[in-house]
Amino acid sequence: FRGVIITKKATRSLAGIAGIVAVATLISKVFGLVREQVIAAAYGVGPVVNAYAFAYVIPGFLLILLGGINGPFHSALVSVLAKRDKSESAPIVETITTLVSAILLAVTVFLIVFANIFIDVLAPGLDAATRSMAIQQLQIMAPMAVLAGLIGIGFGTLNAADQYWLPSLSPLFSSVAVIIGVGLLAWFVGDRIDEPQYVQLGGFVLAGGTLVGALWQWLAQVGAQVKAGLGKLIFRWDWRIPGVSEVLRVMIPATLSSGMLHINVYTDLFFASFIENAAASMRYASFIVLTPLGIMSNMILVPFMPIFSRLTEPENWVELKQRIRQGLLLTALTMLPFTAIFIALAFPVVRVIYQRGAFNLAASEQVVPVLMAYGFGMFFYLGRDVLVRVFYALGDGETPFKVSMVNIFLNGALDFLLYKPFGTPGLVLATVGVNILSMGIFTVILNRRLGGLPLGEWGLSLLGLTVITMLSGVGSWGASWGWEKVFGAGNIFLQLLQLGLASTVAVGLFLLGAMLLKLPELDLLISRVRQKFLKKS
């Protein structure tokens, strides 16, 4: 990746950017993990978290869809601004910000007024008390609609200007706000925090902390954006700027496409409302998976998006195909070890992360099978995103949108078929099935559009890594079982050692097996890790 130019004035390598993003995202994810541990210890899988899981669906959907790094706002702005000077970028950013803010302000009012209808549609199976709490929480978090759009614009604008540290780090402010809110409540009421008389207050604090966190995240970005000369907080309605229409051409279909994908989450939660504590279990399990997934997706998708955008002409397709392969193989090399760990070591992972306070053994047993299902789908989730970014780079947001439309109906059908026989894990497996189908469709279309892809070569490499993943999972399970038989797992110290040993076995076996395949992408990863450690030592 040496010598790859990310902007006109920057000379950072692709791997260098990935390193910056990875470190910043890791810090954010650590704070996110602490946030989830605080919530789990305070409320377990009870009504507060269950209501919050449903109330957060729409604000969270908007924050991920519009405000997320790698989201459509981010992708559209990077693809357009990366080709322009700062003097051209500011008016584009200000115009897009004005339009987005006006639309999302109306969305905020709509959410507040009709919160009860949204909750009833999302979760018809909720009991009266949980429903009431979810409605209140949604009304509190509704202004996150506007903040989500502003955060997404800030992500894309700063990345296009070769600023990666702050955008990747800023989500930690949201986590800190929730930690402070729940922590203060726990300090005031003590062990009674999960008692019935404090349930409503707990829901209010959780939702309020989330809103304050989103506001804090945006304020952290906007200063850097203004300082860099990338647009000020002013109203601008100049739609004649060429770059504005170019951004909208990518942003609108990309937003619709990503929105269709997140409708699958709505569908999952609709069925989850009929399964006791399913929403809370999915929340806790998904966060464990999203921690490494978020770090690796930012490492892979953030630096690759500008590269894809510069290789869209036919004369550059040979290199574009190489970059697509790199994206997919790096995805496999980073995701599959976690798949082995989350399937083979699901119970030790959940026990170490969550099992304390109100989160007891019964709660762990509910979350474990859900974590295994999420772990199985990690590669397909991120691999689909890699291929979608290729379409965005080609200026085609329509194809992902059409595929997402088909997937809505497929996901609903799979949810209906799987939720009764498999319970909560069945809902997760339905989404995994949708992602597998999406990857297949995108691969076939790109194969035709780019004049053929070396699918046989790619497939053999991925098949080899799959076999290695299975073997490393079996080895890590054996190590965990052996440790518990010999030393036990009666305290957190022994549990940490057990999980650390078994995880090391999984990663070690995976690396040994992957080395036999002689993949250049593995050499790249290893060289980057060595460089990082050598710099620190």
Where are these predicted regions, by residue range?
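Membrane-embedded alpha-helical bundles of multi-pass transporters/translocases
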Residues: 1-537
